[in-house]
């Protein structure tokens, strides 16, 4: 009832877009899709998901939200027209940011210190973005060197339309990922980064609706609190 009430207050319409920055198990996303399906019983999975995005910091919440969406959309899924469920493991308060050179950058706080990663904006918007990052993870797990990985994905990057400057930026990110792997951190960072870049690149939504958690500042991890303090002040919160 909370999702219904919240979206009624917003006067959300099926033609509107929606982002839930702390989506949990996806209740508000499901409500938006339910309303779209009610308005158009012949809608495809792609049209039902268009402009709908969820973000959460909890991996289990993201998994639950994706599972809920998959079940709810099952009558509309078509193997000939696959869709990606738009729920991302990311921090809505501290997203990947677009710089002056049209690259998205993000700093991961790891136990071996902060690591900055960047990818070109045009890469994130391409349908093959997640596939390329999945390939990088597979090659990292196979103990490929950074140079060998870059060589293996060169054709993929060129197919996306990246120029030599863009490819160099991706190469630096691959090198940082390999460095983490060499220090005992596995390639799961590829999956985490892909989601955080995709979340940062979510286009502006007509509506933001959700039920965010309430956490005392003093209960946040010290390093995390320090990293977002300046950003929060800039937002006026």
Regions found by a protein language model. Name each.
Residues 1-237:
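SAM-dependent methyltransferase catalytic region
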């Amino acid at each position: 009832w909370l999702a219904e009430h919240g979206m009624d207050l917003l006067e959300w319409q099926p033609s509107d877009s929606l982002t839930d920055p702390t989506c949990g198990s996806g209740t508000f996303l499901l409500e938006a899709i339910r309303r779209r399906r009610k308005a158009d019983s012949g809608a495809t999975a792609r049209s039902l998901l268009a402009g709908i995005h969820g973000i959460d910091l909890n991996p289990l919440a993201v998994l639950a939200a994706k599972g809920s969406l998959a079940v709810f959309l099952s009558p509309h899924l078509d193997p000939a027209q696959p869709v990606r469920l738009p729920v991302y493991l990311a921090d809505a308060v501290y997203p990947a940011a677009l710089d002056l050179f049209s690259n998205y950058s993000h700093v991961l706080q790891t136990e071996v210190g902060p690591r900055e990663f960047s990818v070109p904006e045009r890469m994130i918007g391409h349908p093959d973005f997640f596939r390329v990052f999945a390939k990088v993870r597979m090659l990292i797990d196979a103990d490929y060197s950074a140079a060998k990985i870059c060589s293996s994905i060169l054709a993929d990057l060129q197919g996306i339309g990246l120029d030599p400057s863009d490819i160099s930026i991706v190469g630096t990110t691959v090198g940082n990922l390999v460095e983490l792997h060499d220090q005992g951190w596995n390639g799961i960072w590829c999956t985490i980064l892909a989601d955080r870049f995709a979340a940062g690149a979510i286009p502006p939504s007509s509506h933001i609706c959700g039920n965010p958690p309430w956490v005392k500042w003093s209960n946040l991890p010290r390093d995390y609190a320090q990293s977002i303090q300046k950003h929060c002040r800039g937002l006026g919160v």
